[in-house]
Amino acid sequence: MLFTLTNLKAQKASKINVEYSDFADINQTEIPDALLLTGNVRVSHDGVIFTCNKAYVFQKENYLKAFGEVQMVQGDTLFLNSKYAEYNGEVKQAYATGNVIMRSPESTLVTDTINFNRNTQEAF
């Protein structure tokens, strides 16, 4: 008998990358373990760009909280705008609320709250 073993490794999620902000700070008292970004914030993760007015990036958890004029752009096909969003870089899941508009070449969705799974490209 011949057995073939395949080396299966869990893929390690890439980290959320801070590309730009007017100001960055760390305040362990108010928001522990977060990088506080304000003004013209731009962060990226595996082909998606987030822009907003203010963000908290929790680097250990690979997690983002974005505030004010939030936009998520995935390639040239998906645009999501909202007042507030959260994004989990470990599982590529986004949550957005507050005047949410999601646009793709096929459709436009307007709602108050949305969850988006980047792995399956499903919104619910």
Which residue stretches match the model-derived regions?
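C-terminal segment of classical bacterial N-terminal signal peptides
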Residues: 2-9
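N-terminal amphipathic/hydrophobic interface segments
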Residues: 10-124
